[in-house]
Amino acid sequence: TEMMGEEDGYLAESINKDIEECNAIIEQFIDYLRTGQEMPMEMADLNAVLGEVVAAESGYEREIDTDLQAGEIQVRMHPLSIKRAVANMVVNAARYGNGWIKVSSGSELNRAWFQVEDDGPGIKPEQRKHLFQPFVRGDSARSTSGTGLGLAIVQRIIDNHNGLLEIGTSERGGLSIRAWLPVPVTRGQVKEG
């Protein structure tokens, strides 16, 4: 094989990068479509799932603050999907924030929630409704890489859990995304008609 010049090397490298990005988009799109299918649900501890993601996503480059409700939060869920949703939210916060990320959880009556906050530029209220559409990225996202599918996948996963997503402003002025999940009523609780 003939020797590649330096320029060719750069070109090959950027082509490889493009291919990798295309593959990432295809993989995420398949995930996006797949999340619409029936998922086996089980009772699992939401805090344990959050803890796993925080441990996996924390490292020498990023530290994640946590404020998890004490004890377990038992929710009927597909744990792998919820883990994926939380991871996507954390990656989004890392991409657009300035280094501060906070993951918290809580519950009230018949629903539980988890939330991811960052200290990035935030998103204007009028843009928020588009945030979870595939391939839509906020203004501040234009300078960073990403498939534009991360939060669309989150939306699909939470929808499949009959949950709700709420967008707000974090305590540091960035973006806060809270996911609400229904908590099944246990036999010990009396349902009022």
Give the ranges of each region predicted by the language model:
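Conserved catalytic submotifs in the C-terminal HATPase_c
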Residues: 63-74, 109
